[in-house]
């Protein structure tokens, strides 16, 4: 296991206040930063996709790697297929690949993971994301690369809600937009 000597500081630290806000005590949206993100990108060469897919599935403890735009998980280990030849793995440290098979890149410090849940979460996100987030269209396990206020993000629908992977440099601005827009529904930061 790789040791992590760098002290992590949240990109949202200056504006992360827990509590209930807006709309007369009603809670339509719950916002949460998921701390201590461990995120690796695994890119396969086209001729080695099957081998790399099997290795990523084994590393996360799932039966098989997902197809493009999908995710699978076991416990806290998640395997997202963000592009046809690229996977993101969260929750674990992964072994290196031989250069002939593909590459591994640690993205842990480059993203902020925000979870958006609650009965109005879909409506809130559709104010910013050009995706059909209805339950029948963007089902749990769906993954999309999209734009949030002109910033490229990755969105995954987990079993509990919407998981946003925001570029660290834009995370605070996007967080502020989420909070401002969520006020109309009433929201809680946990």
Language model regions located:
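Basic, glycine/lysine-rich polyanion-binding surfaces/domains
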Residues: 1-190
